């Protein structure tokens, strides 16, 4: 069984982000996983709702 600290995950995109959640002192350059740290494009694509421009102006069909 592998865990997040196994060398298998070294260099994989996002691995340091998850490691920083467990050991923040070892990865101080990583931002916490909060919506406030997401780009506007990612918020629109993956969250939607109030993060999508024009959401409040929708008209019922």
Curated annotation (Swiss-Prot):
What would be the name of the gene that encodes this protein?
A: 52
Pfam families in alphabetical order = GP52 (PF17468)
Q: In its UniProt entry, what is this protein called?
A: Gene 52 protein
Superkingdom field: Viruses
